[in-house]
UniProtKB/Swiss-Prot annotation:
Name of the protein in its database record: Cytochrome P450 90A3
Source species of the chain: Oryza sativa subsp. indica
Job of this protein: Catalyzes the C23-alpha-hydroxylation step in brassinosteroid biosynthesis. Converts 6-deoxocathasterone (6-deoxoCT) to 6-deoxoteasterone (6-deoxoTE) in the late C6-oxidation pathway and cathasterone (CT) to teasterone (TE) in the early C6-oxidation pathway of brassinolide (BL) biosynthesis.
Keywords, ordered alphabetically: Heme, Iron, Membrane, Metal-binding, Monooxygenase, Oxidoreductase, Transmembrane, Transmembrane helix
Similarity comment: family membership: Belongs to the cytochrome P450 family.
Length: 501
């Protein structure tokens, strides 16, 4: 009996190996391989070793603070668009802003988004990330309706309260892993936006399962993973079910409430405050969204809100700490804002619009940190670019990082310099030239990008006006499987004597 799990694991591994061998043989001899084999038409490059290609080199590079050589060396040899072989298939990499613009704009026509099967299974087929065409447009529009209006006074007040509630746990001094604290803020904020539930035992229980789900995104999706709960992916599948069940229970209850009220949430003020994403879904298109569509959609928004914004908050503090002049200027900007307000008065939209240097810091953190290093697409048809033809079915990676850190586009591109964004129209020009795409672009432009800026701005305001801090130990950035600091950025915090927190 004790040998059973081992035998199952061995069988699963054998299935994976056989599948990879068959895939490789098909690439060499199948119909699509006829097009792929015409090397003169494909962008130049190297496919590396059989089966694994250059995957190990890519992972090795992205597990260091300096992954640039992987792309830089190939760009130097082959140009801004080159071919490699990673994660089981031949892939075209683009460090060319013009080609990246084409790929982002062509979503749903010449290309479609493509992600590893591990991510697809854990998010659900009806998630915002994976839907295409009219279905994606429908969900994207709804997300914009809810998340694209950060100027809402109730939302700003809630963000302010949530940030302060977290920071009060640090008084009068504390040692924290800043990334963990930031993730608590972004998770609780996203849950509030989705289902109107305040932080408490329910949200903390959900967050613990959610962390396990996230861990499975870049693990190996063994065919028998549901029978192998001791693997990272198996644990992620179990956590996914628990998160989905918790969301489903809330959605069912809200559907019942809506039915009892004759299809309306009612007119009293308390119910109007419950106008969250679930309510938007229940009212949209005559209530045509199914229960499972709503579960997948809400789960995918948890991913978007939880991971990226919390990393942005952490990296902003890390980069500021390493750049004292920038930190001093940021402190001055926020001290001036606080001096003009009552001591305990929450921030308002006009305050947010009075943070120009803060926006420079956020822009530069996005550019240098590259929380989203790029996006994968798959060709729906043969794509002709310059002298190359990328065949239908080929995977393409548009690298934002390679563009953001290119000295041809930014002077001393790998140096954190928020003052570069003070130049007139710098942001507009960079976006227009497609050399600044931290939130993607085209039909899949991140619908919550402005909300993310607001959250980070409010967080930085309260941090610099209430606390001093210092790093407790050296921490470094890594970029695989996602952008993060290796140790969660541990810092010592001390409440300022004049703070009103």
């Amino acid at each position: 009996m004790a040998a059973a799990p081992v035998l199952l694991l061995a069988a699963a591994a054998a299935v994976v190996v056989v599948a990879m061998v068959l895939r490789w043989l098909l690439l060499l001899g199948g119909p699509a391989a006829g097009r792929l084999g015409k090397r003169a038409l494909m962008p130049p490059g190297s496919t590396g070793l059989p089966l694994i290609g250059e995957t190990l080199r890519l992972i090795s590079a992205y597990k260091t603070p300096n992954p640039e050589p992987f792309i830089d060396e190939r760009v130097a040899r082959h140009g801004g668009v080159f071919t490699t072989h990673v994660f089981g298939e031949r892939t075209v990499f683009s460090a060319d802003p013009a080609f990246n613009r084409l790929l982002l704009a062509a979503e749903g026509r010449a290309v479609h988004s493509s992600y590893p099967s591990s991510i697809a299974t854990l998010l659900g087929a009806r998630s915002l990330l994976l839907t295409r065409g009219a279905a994606h447009k429908r969900l994207h529009s709804l997300t914009l309706t809810r998340l694209g209006r950060p100027a809402s006074p109730p939302l700003l007040a809630h963000i302010d309260r949530l940030v302060l509630a977290t920071m009060r746990q640090w008084e009068p001094a504390a040692t924290v892993r800043l990334m963990d604290e930031a993730k608590k803020i972004t998770f609780n904020l996203t849950v509030k936006q989705l289902v109107s539930i305040e932080p408490g035992p329910w949200t903390e229980s959900l967050r613990r399962e959610y962390v396990k789900l996230i861990d499975g995104f870049f693990s190996i999706p063994f065919p028998l993973a549901n029978l192998l709960p001791f693997t990272t992916y198996g644990q992620a599948l179990k956590a996914r079910k628990k998160v989905a069940d918790a969301l489903r229970e809330v959605i069912k209850k809200r559907m019942e409430e809506k039915a009892e009220n004759g299809g309306s949430i009612g007119d009293d003020e308390g119910k109007k405050e419950k106008k969250d994403m679930v309510e938007e879904l229940l009212e949209a298109e005559g209530g045509s969204f199914s229960e499972e569509e709503m579960v997948d959609f809400c789960l995918s928004l948890l991913v978007a809100g939880y991971e990226t914004t919390s990393v942005l908050m952490t990296l902003a503090v890390k980069f500021l700490t390493e750049t004292p002049a920038a930190l001093a200027e940021l402190k001055e900007e926020h001290a001036n804002i606080r001096d003009m307000k009552g001591k305990k008065q929450p921030l308002e939209w006009s305050d947010y619009k009075s943070m120009p240097f803060t926006q420079c810091v956020i822009n530069e953190t996005l550019r240098v940190g590259n929380i989203i290093s790029g996006v994968f697409r798959r060709a729906n048809t043969d794509i002709h670019y310059k002298d190359y033809t990328i065949p239908k079915g080929c995977k393409i990676f548009a690298s934002f990082r390679a563009v953001h850190l290119n000295n041809e586009h930014y002077e001393n591109a790998r140096t954190f310099n928020p003052w570069r964004w003070q130049i007139n129209n710098k942001l507009q020009n960079a976006v227009g030239a497609n050399i600044f795409t931290p939130f993607g672009g085209g039909p899949r432009l991140c619908p919550g990008y402005e909300l993310a800026r607001v959250v980070v701005s409010i967080f930085l305001h309260h941090l610099v006006t209430r606390f001093s801090w210092e790093e407790t130990e050296e921490d470094r950035l890594v970029f695989f499987p996602t952008t993060r600091t290796l140790k969660g950025y541990p810092i010592n915090l001390r409440l300022l004597s004049e703070s009103i927190c």
